[in-house]
Amino acid sequence: MATTTSKTNTGYVTQVIGPVLDVSFPNGQLPKIYNAITVKGKNEAGQDITVTCEVQQLLGDNQVRAVSMSTTDGILRGMEVTDSGAAISVPVGTPTLGRIFNVLGEPVDELGAVVCDSTLPIHRPSPAFTQLETKSSIFETGIKVVDLLAPYRRGGKIGLFGGAGVGKTVLIMELINNIAKAHGGVSVFGGVGERTREGNDLYQEMKESKVIDENNLPASKVALVYGQMNEPPGARMRVALTALTMAEYFRDVNNQDVLLFIDNIFRFVQAGSEVSALLGRMPSAVGYQPTLGTEMGSLQERITSTTKGSITSIQAVYVPADDLTDPAPATTFAHLDATTVLSRNLAAKGIYPAVDPLDSTSTMLQPGIVGEKHYACAQRVKGILQRYKELQDIISILGLDELSEDDRLAVARARRVERFLSQPFFVAEVFTGSPGKYVSLEDTIKGFTMILDGELDELPEQSFYLVGDIQEAISKGQKLLAEAK
């Protein structure tokens, strides 16, 4: 959806190399860098072709080099190319909710055109220093393990690490649900270079869990933007900017708190690397593009809190060959405020969300930001879980009875803490049958402090499993004790 100017410049294709086109324009009528140009014509089979490209280089001799946003199959030399006079622009605002878009802002869910008053270009400057929110504040998610041990920063960036099948999608959907209910905010999901099947699964699950309301789309809580694995690298490189532009509108114009999901940030870097090679740039370390830091920075710096609203971004991070020193994840880490690590061991135990309490980190967990009470409680929880982890080998070889009295007590409380870190989700009600729970930070701290102080040692472990606040655990425990008599 590129806007057109009254005077259109027209050129013609001189060379096609995969997703990269060279186009010749009349003297003095060259398009600017990042302008959208459109190739229109018929292929050899007589079918209409419309391909939008983005200008990346001005080569001299009235030639420009552009990267295609869709397949270049059927494009022939000599085909007419029109300069739109502006960057790729996408629809923004409430009409985007509940819909799926491609990189150009065109709906791809077969639900008809999007009627939208305003569009915005995907290339925009990051907010000025004077517009930024200077105070660090916590973004409460209502998920106990996250809020207590690795709290999110309002307007911050969070890395989400986890393999297949440990609950990334369910956690993402719960966060989308909770921001809508607790903060009156909306979410934008950017699917960058991931599997089309996963994108379809996510869409279907969102409809099932009512995150997307099919009967009343504007009441949905999320807009989806997909540029999947089968797309050319130009689309995968720019789809994150399309999603971010939609999120910026909700922040700057609607003054809302927005969650922006990027799955997967590594694919954004990978697509940039492919485009860089196609444009003939000299590769940098490990074959990545020399502009890696600049590209990542221009995306990440737009994700921030302003005085009007905030964009909090949760980015799934794929670590190639589990090598954290690889330039792609290493560049990403420099921008992150918190990490949420999902553990297969916890998922195997049935503890959901399977967030690893010891591996997950946050720069917000400081007494000056979260307060002494929260900080002390979090450190005690981490301490007792670390002690339990250290004793695991002894327990598995010799059994619990061989431990000292103090260690046995620590293990008993750690097992209660571990179970209390689990929580029923609203979006999982469809599968589990148990109603979801949103737990305030105050209730979370109170609950864990009571367990650590030994006030609930008489309750069975099972009473802390998949409950909301501590009162629910106490009621469940008393019921279990009454049944056991």
UniProtKB/Swiss-Prot annotation:
UniProt catalytic activity: ATP + H2O + 4 H(+)(in) = ADP + phosphate + 5 H(+)(out)
InterPro entries in UniProt: AAA+_ATPase, ATP-synt_VA_C, ATP_synth_F1_bsu, ATPase_a/bsu_AS, ATPase_alpha/beta_chains, ATPase_F1/V1/A1_a/bsu_N, ATPase_F1/V1/A1_a/bsu_N_sf, ATPase_F1/V1/A1_a/bsu_nucl-bd
Compartments, as annotated in UniProt: Plastid, Cyanelle thylakoid membrane
GO molecular function: ATP binding; ATP hydrolysis activity; proton-transporting ATP synthase activity, rotational mechanism
E.C. number: 7.1.2.2
Record Pfam families: ATP-synt_ab (PF00006), ATP-synt_ab_N (PF02874), ATP-synt_VA_C (PF22919)
Keyword ATP-binding among UniProt keywords: yes
Chain positions recorded as ATP binding sites: 162-169
Protein's membrane topology: Peripheral membrane protein
GO biological process entries: proton motive force-driven mitochondrial ATP synthesis
PROSITE patterns named among the record's database cross-references: ATPASE_ALPHA_BETA
KW Membrane (keyword) present: yes
Keywords (A to Z) from UniProt: ATP synthesis, ATP-binding, CF(1), Cyanelle, Hydrogen ion transport, Ion transport, Membrane, Nucleotide-binding, Plastid, Thylakoid, Translocase, Transport
Family: Belongs to the ATPase alpha/beta chains family.
Cited NCBIfam families: atpD
Function in brief: Produces ATP from ADP in the presence of a proton gradient across the membrane. The catalytic sites are hosted primarily by the beta subunits.
Subunit structure: F-type ATPases have 2 components, CF(1) - the catalytic core - and CF(0) - the membrane proton channel. CF(1) has five subunits: alpha(3), beta(3), gamma(1), delta(1), epsilon(1). CF(0) has four main subunits: a(1), b(1), b'(1) and c(9-12).
PANTHER family: ATP SYNTHASE, ATP SYNTHASE SUBUNIT BETA, MITOCHONDRIAL
Protein name, UniProt field: ATP synthase subunit beta, cyanelle
Native source species: Cyanophora paradoxa
